[in-house]
From Swiss-Prot:
Highest classification ranks of the organism: Bacteria, Pseudomonadati, Campylobacterota, Epsilonproteobacteria, Campylobacterales
Residue ranges of domain Radical SAM core in the record: 108-341
EC number of this enzyme: 2.1.1.192
Keywords, comma-separated and alphabetical: 4Fe-4S, Cytoplasm, Disulfide bond, Iron, Iron-sulfur, Metal-binding, Methyltransferase, rRNA processing, S-adenosyl-L-methionine, Transferase, tRNA processing
GO biological process, alphabetically ordered: rRNA base methylation; tRNA methylation
Cysteine pairs bridged by disulfides in the record: C115-C346
Gene (UniProt): rlmN
Gene3D superfamilies: 1.10.150.530, Aldolase class I
Binding site for [4Fe-4S] cluster: C122, C126, C129
SUPFAM superfamilies listed in its UniProt record: Radical SAM enzymes
Cofactor: [4Fe-4S] cluster
Pfam family, one: RlmN_N
Family stated for the protein in its record: Belongs to the radical SAM superfamily. RlmN family.
GO CC field: cytoplasm
Identification of the protein by name: Dual-specificity RNA methyltransferase RlmN
């Protein structure tokens, strides 16, 4: 039996090499990404013989949701099974946004962020992250990354034109899978598809300096987030073994070369761990480290998980840390840990066993 190919893996120009004329490719994209077709037979504007040809050669169901959990804060965690039986987790993070209309009335509507996985597992070995405990199984294809987003939007009846933010902060190190992640960025940005601008896509990395430079040279227009978590190499190597390969100085050099929109900043994620990296002297060192860089610091309070010896710091200490940074001119926020009660927060995602 012929093995079907995942059509979500293809950019329009690639699909155009297999399907003629090109306007049919645009129609296919629209059916999949905008009309949320469930199968090729739904694509009524296509000739019947083309629909049959597509069904003989392609599929567009690279992920299957086997479980979802909703948090009391509205976040939803999805457990997806891939075609080979491996599993990844993704999270939908809804937030209310208020705006004032032309008549001065306050309007409230939902704003969505989707946190996607780029690998099954991870080899970075960060001591505070549950994903790393199982090691790396494999990279996800571009279509498997896109498939998570498409499924979540379709399942939640989020119109394709509704703006969403994508954060590559789920399972895996995105820059360790740069080829497929960068392709996913391009597929998501297609006007005939989900039309998610690269400026709404944030790629997070544990600090792969070489790949940060490669990503910058691609000029995709994406936002960059650095998982820093320490201000000196000794502590960072203890928390994040990847620091042995790319130390803080190498990361900062790569960040300085990274092209960013004048209105944007590079985000530095800093996980506050009680008694480890949350002292005010750490905050002072962080100010020095970020000198001359258009940076925004996102403070995250450690999210506990089974087997971890680390503790979550008090909000009071986090605010003191934030105040010191802010008073020194560093833009700084404390991230609200959404999905904490369903293990969907930062550092809590993992490949769940099939018996679940």
């Amino acid at each position: 039996m012929k093995e079907l190919v995942n059509i979500l893996d293809f950019l329009p120009e690639e699909l155009g090499e297999k399907i003629k004329p090109m306007f049919r490719v645009k129609q296919i994209y629209q059916w999949i990404y905008q009309k949320y077709a469930n199968n090729f037979s739904d694509m009524s504007s296509l000739p019947k013989d083309l629909r049959l040809e597509l069904a003989r050669n392609f599929h567009f169901s690279p992920v299957k949701c086997v479980k979802n959990e909703q948090s009391k804060d509205g976040s939803i965690k999805y457990l997806f099974e891939l075609i080979d039986g491996l599993r990844v987790e993704s999270v939908l993070l809804p937030m209310k946004e208020e705006k004032i209309d032309a008549e001065g009335k306050r309007i409230s509507h939902a704003r969505y962020t989707i946190c996607v996985s780029s690998q099954v597992g991870c080899k970075s070995g960060c001591s505070f992250c549950l994903t790393a405990k199982g090691g790396l199984k494999r990279n996800l294809s571009a279509g498997e990354i896109v498939g998570q987003i498409l499924w979540i939007k379709k399942q939640n009846n989020i119109p394709y034109e509704r703006r969403v933010n994508i954060v590559y902060m789920g399972m895996g190190e995105p820059l360790d899978n740069l080829k497929n992640v960068s392709k996913a960025v391009k597929i998501l940005a297609q006007n005939e598809g989900l039309a998610i601008s690269p400026r709404r896509q944030t790629i997070s990395t544990s600090g792969l300096a070489k790949q940060i430079k490669e990503l910058g040279q691609m000029n995709l227009g994406v936002l960059l987030a650095i998982s820093l978590h320490a201000v000196n190499d000794e502590l960072r190597t203890e928390l994040m073994p990847i620091n042995k390969a790319y130390n803080i100085a190498a990361i900062m050099d790569a960040v300085r070369e990274f092209p960013i929109d004048q209105r944007k900043r590079v985000m530095f994620e800093y996980l506050l761990i009680d008694g480890i990296n949350d002292k005010l002297e750490h905050a002072k060192e962080l100010v020095k480290l970020l000198n001359g860089i258009k940076a925004k610091v996102n403070l995250i309070l450690f999210n506990p998980h089974e087997g971890s010896l680390y503790k979550r710091p008090s909000l009071e200490n986090a605010i003191k840390f934030q105040d010191l940074l802010s008073n020194k001119g560093v833009t700084c926020t404390i991230r609200e840990s959404k999905g904490l009660d369903i293990s969907a927060a930062c550092g809590q995602l993992k490949e769940r066993a099939k018996e679940q």
